[in-house]
């Protein structure tokens, strides 16, 4: 096992990465190794997808499957080894079908890629795990060095984050051939074990630029189906009655669940990154969407154990449900998996609803505590002139984009302390689950404009980028000249690709934490600092002083 893709990876003087029987996330060495094998199979599939496009062949089954299967290897998504192997077998079957299509056009069609003809050696998981050793990401570290390995992983993990957003967009009916062609090209190239530093750096920026387009079609999918988010108050306390909790990012799953629970007497609560769903008109119209439950994903083993109903996981993040003994009432959807947990293959939630009706639910309603979400792209752009006016009248000094992933590391209290230290004449724009560090606190307003503005899920960084570009255009300056600072927390690969997106768009002087990614060497961090001004957090006092004086 070698896995260094998330923030909680093991760090030692001898090197970084989880390499024992089990990773810090709970992923076993078997599952981790089989995910490496799956990625190799997907690289071979992409190599043939690139070749097929040369012949004008576009296989939509391949395009829809490849990013989805890659998404299953993202942190805290799928811990079920047999399902990972199932994805690998499906990748190979699709590859062979695509290869046959190419050979039908050109009998001499071939692909020069080491993954292009990969076959699984056995049905036995142990044998497959031994085969997977051939594809361990750091297998040639001694030959290429830590810097090249780090850049390869930056590209691989960044592309994995983009694949997750591609799947979210695909579920909502969004498709862009140029994006899929670019994805396959990059995925196939990474399967050749590239070792050119400049080419890898360029690839990382290409991934960032591609992901901006992905976020654009995802935004179009969400707003096209569910309307543009508008500011909405959400209760974060319990309401009496039967209940279901839904977590993850998939708004379509939430919509289907709301439709199927309507009139059943079962209330629905969002959790984690599903909180922004309350801002969408077509979702909040369901009166039994009664609130949001819990805090950051890392607290789920305690909070889920206390929730008196079933739980549905639509995407990341899931962690071991046996710890809180709720594994008999947690359900997985789509690419999510945990051994022994029931999986929903389709859109029918009737079994979950039946379980909810059989459980006690909340016995009484707690005193409501309301927070505000729903500052989507249209709302943000509608406030652009107000922001400019406040800045011109020196009522608004600075905007801090304070967001990203949450996690268990104690140093993450930095983000709570930073938020509460932001001066009263400054505004906090937040997104993603890092907001749970401070989103239940009171921040007041500036002439009626809330000082805490929740822009949505992690992919809604797109809205923040569009706002920044709009403000810069109206003020006749560059984005980096705005009174705007980005302080980002990271945990997994979606955060990595968001960072690459920002860097590829030329955004500079981003501050990140709580630690630097374990796969980035001091040399690589120095390069990113020199090119983009990217740096790690220090202390709240020092960072606040530096950012306000910039």
From Swiss-Prot:
Induction statement: By Fnr, NarL and NarP under anaerobic conditions in the presence of either nitrate or nitrite.
Cofactor requirements of the protein: [2Fe-2S] cluster; hybrid [4Fe-2O-2S] cluster
Activity modulation: Inhibited by oxygen. Activated by cyanide except in the prolonged presence of excess cyanide, where the enzyme is inactivated.
Ligand binding ([2Fe-2S] cluster): 3, 6, 18, 25
Primary location group: cytoplasm
Family: Belongs to the HCP family.
Gene: hcp
Enzyme's top EC category: oxidoreductase
Name under which the protein is recorded: Hydroxylamine reductase
Record PTM Cysteine persulfide, positions in chain: 405
Function: Catalyzes the reduction of hydroxylamine to form NH(3) and H(2)O. Is also able to reduce hydroxylamine analogs such as methylhydroxylamine and hydroxyquinone. Might have a role as a scavenger of potentially toxic by-products of nitrate metabolism.
CDD domains: HCP
Alphabetized HAMAP family for the sequence: Hydroxylam_reduct
GO biological process, one term: response to hydrogen peroxide
Entry's Gene Ontology cellular component terms: cytoplasm
Residue numbers binding hybrid [4Fe-2O-2S] cluster: 249, 273, 317, 405, 433, 458, 492, 494
